[in-house]
Regions:
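Basic, Lys/Arg-enriched C-terminal extension of HTH/homeodomain DNA-binding domains
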Residues: 46-66
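Helix-turn-helix DNA-binding segment
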Residues: 1-38, 63
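Residues within the DNA-recognition helix of helix-turn-helix
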Residues: 40-43
Length: 66
């Protein structure tokens, strides 16, 4: 998404976490493993400069990406 480098799947992942869906359930919904969800989440956090999943969700919500 723009110069941030978040894909549509990244935004879906963050939106699901924002709803309170567990990492493993997000993985099942996206047809990937929970480990892959965690790896993607770490990449998202690194790209946007935050330390935690909660911060990543808040970052995306503040920018109305999710």
């Amino acid at each position: 998404m723009g110069d941030i480098g978040l894909s549509a799947d990244d935004l879906v992942l963050l939106a699901e976490l924002a709803k309170g869906v567990t990492v493993d359930r997000v993985g099942r919904r996206l047809d990937i493993s929970g480990r892959t969800v965690r790896r993607r989440l770490r990449g998202i956090c690194d790209r946007i400069g935050v330390a935690t999943a909660i911060e990543a969700v808040a970052w995306a919500a503040r920018r109305r990406l999710i």
